Amino acid sequence: MMLPKEIMMPNDNPYALHRVKVLKVYSLTETEKLFLFRFEDPELAEKWTFKPGQFVQLTIPGVGEVPISICSSPMRKGFFELCIRKAGRVTTVVHRLKPGDTVLVRGPYGNGFPVDEWEGMDLLLIAAGLGTAPLRSVFLYAMDNRWKYGNITFINTARYGKDLLFYKELEAMKDLAEAENVKIIQSVTRDPNWPGLKGRPQQFIVEANTNPKNTAVAICGPPRMYKSVFEALINYGYRPENIFVTLERRMKCGIGKCGHCNVGTSTSWKYICKDGPVFTYFDIVSTPGLLD
């Protein structure tokens, strides 16, 4: 018996697989590509939604599946974008996809950032490396809903200029962004030939146009950067309860069944895929292993 279509929506059935078509593929760096997908079912495309910070499981039949954070704005119906790094068997096959190819997705999964609770606040986004991708979703959503938020600063960093994700896109937005009290800071940490800004993300917090007492902070990057960024934020007066991070680590099934991403102790533990991937500052400091 066929189930009613509304019951088969991916937001309702966490196990449902849905066919999506590759519309465009952009090479961002030597190892990252940006894929634009569209659901083949037009009704599904209209109903499917997500929150910034959520992820999907991308499936290549006969090869495997991989969890990937959505990096587009949920306001752009019918389409979604994934920034995918070639780092293993599945993602190597994904990087061979061309416009017109089809794959399967399930999701979205995870909690996402509490963007509704942030309305009326300034936003400070701090990204490093591949961490730029999920924060791009937050940034584009905030730009699509500009009237809901105060000043915005996006700090985007990488080790080398060639690895700076979405550099051209963000540079092209700078003039318009500044007119809307949006500040974009892009920096590298190791590139001796880089003509632009150089420095680690925490060094640019002081340049943000945000009010520390009324700012929601979203952070994503390699685990080693969090401690220094946390310390800088607290020193500048940002409230710990308004600091959020998203972690893309150890996830496998996406729904908390396999236990692969379970971290912590018998008294304090989390599933990164189900309880996260977005966590508060207090989650981080109270749950051993979240950043290991």
From Swiss-Prot:
One GO CC annotation: cytoplasm
EC number: 1.12.98.4
Free-text comment on the cofactor: Binds 1 FAD per subunit. Binds 1 [2Fe-2S] cluster.
Residue ranges of every copy of the FAD-binding FR-type domain listed in the record: 15-115
Residues bound to [2Fe-2S] cluster: 253, 258, 261, 273
Activity's dependence on pH: Optimum pH is 8.4 for sulfur reductase activity at 80 degrees Celsius.
Protein role: Part of a bifunctional enzyme complex that functions as an NADPH-dependent hydrogen-evolving hydrogenase with sulfur reducing activity. May play a role in hydrogen cycling during fermentative growth. Activity not exhibited with NAD. The beta and gamma subunits form the sulfur reducing component that catalyzes the cytoplasmic production of hydrogen sulfide in the presence of elemental sulfur. Not active in the presence of sodium sulfate, sodium sulfite, sodium thiosulfate or cysteine.
Official protein name in the record: Sulfhydrogenase 1 subunit gamma
Organism: Pyrococcus furiosus (strain ATCC 43587 / DSM 3638 / JCM 8422 / Vc1)
